[in-house]
Amino acid sequence: MPIITDVYAREVLDSRGNPTIEVEVFTESGALGRALVPSGASTGEHEAVELRDGDKDRYMGKGVLKAVENVNEIIAPEIIEGDFSVLDQVSIDKMMIALDGTDNKGKLGANAILGVSIAVARAAADYLGVPLYKYLGGFNGTELPVPMMNIVNGGSHSDAPIAFQEFMVLPVGAPNFKEALRWGAEIFHNLAKILKGRNLSTAVGDEGGFAPTFEGTEDAVETILEAIKAAGLEPGKDVFLGFDCAASEFFENGVYDYAKFEGENGKKRTSSEQVDYLEELVDKYPIITIEDGMDENDWEGWKALTDRLGNKVQLVGDDLFVTNTKILERGINEGVGNSILIKVNQIGTLTETFEAIEMAQKAGYTAVVSHRSGETEDTTIADIAVATNAGQIKTGSLSRTDRIAKYNQLLRIEDELFETAKFKGLNAFYNLNK
């Protein structure tokens, strides 16, 4: 029987050497589910709470023993005494939400709740003898996502003097995921050669992208375009560009202050000037997606950006929407953004994650399944991307095992799906005038 007999959590480490939580779910049948929870560096203020211990004598205050204790001493007894089956995903998720009793999961911690939620799903897949993506998506989950590859890191993810947090390449012209991954890897390695030729650093940031001391945003973009061409690919046809501006990280007192990351060369821009600047970049370069181009609370700015660019560029809300259906609903009603970034730990359960994806897709918004800057070897987001036919995944650069693990899982899934596997490429951006 798939009745849950034990739930156990422990403190482990993420890709930055910071503590995170791992949860295991055991059943009468012997089926097992294990999940590790990611962590973000730049976080939206409306995200669900990641519970940390705050004990400066352990891991500089970043320990997660409280979250571990909440799983082992509060959540686990409720599940075991309730005779829950691993197939009761929605019921278990709703029980944990009620047990927490707060709007932001601040009592038990979203990291504690999410670890259990994913581990339950993995145990269910193990019990049924099917891959996780098939358990979550049934026979409909056949679309491999376009990878959004973060090959240059800036902002809060590196020490590079660039305000924008991520510069991404999207190999939309590839015939399948396997080739898209190869294209990305070849761009990455060609970029390394170019950087070495300029005596620039090839050290990598949190998400595996390079973090050299470029002379500014346009220098970074021009260098990436050079790498695309060096890989034998055509910008604007085979490969498009994307930014994660993470604008909330440098928005202060109503001003987008690039000097926070770029020093004396950084400009200060008003909300309208920020929109103008992003439009200039879109007009100049083959950019297909911009994430968090405006501050999470600058709804007027977001609306202006959407009115200006929303028909030709994917405008992704990360800090804006934080995988929250209530906030997403407001965005849909007000015509703000046209895409949502999906981060499982922003909301805290698989059930709520799937609800956000469904709401977005029904409204004609795209959904981009995403990692966090503090990752683990857990590959759940790869399965979620396929299960929901999200069409896009953002899981870092072409280095660091914590990033590559997700890409390798997608390669396995593509092989398993065989002839039923789909890769839509440019058509994954279904709400743009291409």
Curated annotation (Swiss-Prot):
Signal peptide: none
Native species: Macrococcus caseolyticus (strain JCSC5402) (Macrococcoides caseolyticum)
GO cellular component, one term: cell surface
Residues annotated as catalytic: 207, 343
Co-factor note (free text): Binds a second Mg(2+) ion via substrate during catalysis.
Family: Belongs to the enolase family.
GO biological process, one term: glycolytic process
Cofactor(s) for this UniProt protein: Mg(2+)
Catalytic activity: (2R)-2-phosphoglycerate = phosphoenolpyruvate + H2O
PROSITE patterns: ENOLASE
Keyword Endoplasmic reticulum appears in the UniProt entry: no
Binding locations of (2R)-2-phosphoglycerate: 165, 343, 372-373, 394
Pfam family, any one: Enolase_C
Organism superkingdom: Bacteria
Keyword Transcription (UniProt): no
InterPro entries, A to Z: Enolase, Enolase-like_C_sf, Enolase-like_N, Enolase_C, Enolase_CS, Enolase_N
Compartment annotation: Cytoplasm; Secreted; Cell surface
Pathway: Carbohydrate degradation; glycolysis; pyruvate from D-glyceraldehyde 3-phosphate: step 4/5
Protein name: Enolase
SUPFAM superfamilies on file: Enolase C-terminal domain-like, Enolase N-terminal domain-like
Function description: Catalyzes the reversible conversion of 2-phosphoglycerate (2-PG) into phosphoenolpyruvate (PEP). It is essential for the degradation of carbohydrates via glycolysis.
Protein EC: 4.2.1.11
Main location: cytoplasm
Annotated binding of Mg(2+), by residue: 244, 291, 318
Keywords: Cytoplasm, Glycolysis, Lyase, Magnesium, Metal-binding, Secreted
GO molecular function: magnesium ion binding; phosphopyruvate hydratase activity
